[in-house]
């Protein structure tokens, strides 16, 4: 038996050597090799063609929100560094999600269960991968069908469509770099919409054919401390400033009016103010003729809504912000904001806007105890209007407009009253002044409840949780500057801020607005600007292990259009404000 055993071992060794020689990569476990807190950035070309049969005047949109951000972030990877933990949420992105998963270098069959947005049934994706070739290439094919069990459960829901399709493609993996260097392929989908009645309108069965062509090409592998990352951010800022200047020039050359100052429906003054704020925070000279024309226009407009008034006050305060204040407070050399000294004309305007803003509250509650805002004077409220009202009031207070301490205490009561509590824990936060000294120690502290906030009722979202953190931070800062405030109320507010950061740590993403799946594609850049503001107000550099600024910046770098925009001028202003990291200064309790 010994000669036979030796022969068998020799045969197995030779077979293994041959297999390795033919495809050495296929015998390895593939893993992503990315810098700490870093990521791989890609250039993505996505083409989508849609046909509707029979032709209808109304067909629901198939794709909900922006496609997948063309990047792989180190802190989004599973512990095995073979796949991303972010689930696929859009059929456009199925090819990329399969190609970025490195768990099957030897090829074979596997099944992915994809939870898409509520418009579709959950999908079953049956994948066939070819063996990884010596050059790193690997073929991909898949069939996509509705999960039959889920379809039976949800078959009476008229808002859910059925999707099926096929895709073909290939990826190339560079073992030396530890990254996927390219993805290319195509897919064809058929979407069936059931017939249903909405009001008096009967909507018949609808069918849609979709063809997708998707290409990814590796652009760069970057880390937060790389000079190349800083260079790219600087270029993105430059390009977005140029885009906003171009759009602002066009709009101011026409007849820019306030639409009568309707607080519920007229948002043009607020959009103008947001763009002026972004340009001023980006470092544009106050003496610039375009900026002067924009501010002159803003000063003459009739402004009534809470959003518009809040942002207009922020834009005005930006004219008088000391140029070195942000860096002084960021490094800890300065503890409290410097009082602003606006001109007499601007101070009068700020007082007028502040008076209007203080009147846009919910009239159904005692404003001395509970203060919350809506678009105008109203019997309702929402946390988005409330956040922007408080941003404006805090900026006005920095400019010398007197705000009663009752406004801040009653606002704190509101935010504490409408939290959405979760599990307890200690948020792991690294502060900017510690990181600047090379200290990456996470400050844990006492356990708190993770708390999020919603727009009104419902589940917590990332955009509204950052709003709650920012609002409470500004209210407590104002009370500390005034040397007012009940110590217990301040402590409760500080604990809620820490709870908000714990919620963000537990739900963190820059790919979508965290919270219920249906909210993911909504208000993404609004959320990013809110994330920047919440973290900068509290001088937070790292949320747990996540570098929120690097990840958010990468999301913006790979999605910025060739003309410098991220959509309309409001979206571009939000993107620019995130990249510049110039939130209002706050006096915290630390």
List each model region and its residues.
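Bacterial N-terminal signal peptides that target proteins for export
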Residues: 2-15
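General helical structural elements
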Residues: 10-13, 48, 537
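Preference for long, amphipathic alpha-helical scaffolds in soluble/luminal domains
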Residues: 213-590
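Hydrophobic core
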Residues: 16-24
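Signature of exported/secreted
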Residues: 27-224, 391
